[in-house]
Amino acid sequence: MNLPTKITFSRIIATVILIITLFVLSVIPGLSTPELGNTKVNLIFLCVFVFFVIASYTDHLDGKLARKNNQVTDLGKFLDPVADKLLVNSMLIFLCAPWVFAPYAVEQISFIPVWCVIIMVARDIVVDALRFIAAQKGVVIAANIFGKLKTVLQMVAIGAVLLNDFPFHYIYPKNPYPQYLSVTAFLVYFATLTSLISGIIYVVQNRKAFLEDKQ
């Protein structure tokens, strides 16, 4: 196992440990964590944010090292998207109901709507299924720019939710609008829309690969 693949694999292990840790914290009765000053940022969520940023960077790092050192392997190609989806989708699910998965974050006002999570996770399931079908026919479905943009926007939106709309809430300290009209909320909506568009593009661009065996 080369270095880029080790980095990818370590991201999977770290994500699993994070999920288990957050679950354990969620079942500790009476646990509450302070905020960072007057920022409304929960300290546990801040730690998760730091981990998420580092993990997101390793997603870029392992691919860069693999291409630079000519260490691209089939195992790396398989593990990289698995690591990405495990990291992003687990955080999407965790943040869709912070009062359920993180009852210690009593002041958390930012979250990801359930319908957004359903769209983004369903999109990944559909695209992965299509890729599997195409691979069985010897067809490789390449990532498109919308797919890459989708991942970046998801990571930005997740980061904004973890920081509880910081620093955007300083723009409207006495915001008369509901939370679903905040800057963070629109980042989530944009990521959801891009995810849906990229999924449609994958299906349309590669539809011939799925129709060939019917001829």
Indicate residue ranges for each PLM-predicted region:
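Alpha-helical transmembrane bundles and membrane-interface segments of multipass inner-membrane proteins
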Residues: 1-215
